[in-house]
A protein has these predicted regions:
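Conserved class I S-adenosyl-L-methionine
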Residues: 192-213
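N-terminal, positively charged/glycine-rich alpha-helical extensions of SAM-dependent methyltransferases
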Residues: 2-54
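A conserved beta-strand element that flanks and buttresses the S-adenosyl-L-methionine
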Residues: 161
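Class I SAM-dependent methyltransferase SAM/SAH-binding core
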Residues: 94-149
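Conserved alpha-helix/loop element of class I SAM-dependent methyltransferases that forms part
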Residues: 60-83, 100
Length: 300
């Protein structure tokens, strides 16, 4: 059951400071290990901090892909020239996914809500918005919180998106979050969770899991949970997603792995080349895929 059964929040319950909304218990949230980890990671996340220091003549300012690349996966299937009223992004980071959707897919919206637990990443999203002006006609609302309760009315969001996020969220919180998504998304709305779940059957993850059991005190606090396709479907069904989005797909990513490419930060020789060479048969894709995406259908 979602926490919203007992508590209902709105943005009026948050404090707006320098373009970011903060919950009333932000000082308490700042003391959690999970937030401290992501604030630290956010400072240098995938080199995105370079947007804050590059000169006016830098090619990065002319070509966003030099900063972020082009996210693939389900985003390749996203329709062109779609327009919606409201977009909610869970784990927005510095805005990589909406930047791509705005520039390459011409997705348009009137309101964009971005939620992330990392304040440094939200501050960087503001800078990315200034530099590239994605969703040029939209109101922007950035919210620094853990997203256990979404501060929106029932049936108020047209499109919920997320990119490579849910493997970082503890399982009970993820289940609550999916119930919240089912609450706030409009009937007939859309969701796209690209590469958002790690695959529990992937050989690479199985090796990592074995190593973590050997040294449990030094487990990576970032990657918290893995799922099978059927478990993901069960989470979505139990959350009530089908009452709003009757049809959806859970599909394996096209990134496959039989070997970890790093262990405890140490590169494994030839692992990347071996993983990139994999071309599994259809029957093996769900086993060898690094993760899963889930999205409502049709994407139109």
């Amino acid at each position: 059951m979602s926490p919203s059964a007992n508590v209902q929040l709105s943005l009026n319950d948050f404090e707006l400071r320098d373009g970011v909304y903060f919950p009333s218990d932000y000082a308490q949230l700042n003391q959690t290990k999970h937030k401290q980890t992501w604030d630290r990671i956010g400072k240098t996340y995938y080199g995105s901090q370079k947007i804050e220091t590059v000169g006016e003549a830098s090619p990065i300012k002319q070509d966003y892909t030099l900063l972020s690349g082009k996210p693939g996966g389900t985003w390749n299937k996203f329709p062109v020239d779609k327009s919606v009223d409201t977009i909610l992004e869970l784990g927005s980071g510095y805005g990589r996914a909406p930047l791509h959707l705005s520039k390459d897919k011409n997705l348009q919206c009137q309101k964009y809500y971005g939620i992330d637990i990392s304040e440094p990443l939200l501050r960087r999203l503001i800078k990315v918005k200034q530099e590239y002006n994605f969703f040029p006609d939209a109101e922007f609302h950035l919210i620094c919180t853990s997203a256990e309760i979404l501060p929106f009315p029932d049936n108020s969001i047209d499109l919920v998106i997320s990119n490579c996020v849910f493997m970082h969220i503890p399982d009970p919180q993820l289940r609550n979050l999916m119930a919240e998504v089912a609450r706030v998304i409009k009937p007939g709305g859309m969701f796209v969770f690209n590469h958002s779940f790690h695959n529990k059957d992937c050989p690479s993850h199985l090796v990592h899991n074995f190593i973590r059991k050997l040294n449990p005190v030094s487990r990576n606090p970032v990657y918290l949970k893995q799922y099978s396709a059927s478990e993901i479907g069960q989470i979505l069904d139990n959350a009530g997603i089908k009452t709003k989005c009757p049809q959806y797909v859970v599909e394996p990513t096209t990134e496959y792995a039989i070997l970890p490419e790093t262990i405890k930060g140490i590169p494994i020789p030839f692992a990347k080349a071996i993983n990139r060479s994999l071309k599994p048969a259809e029957s093996q894709k769900s086993k060898l895929a690094y993760g899963f995406s889930a999205y409502s259908t049709p994407l139109a």
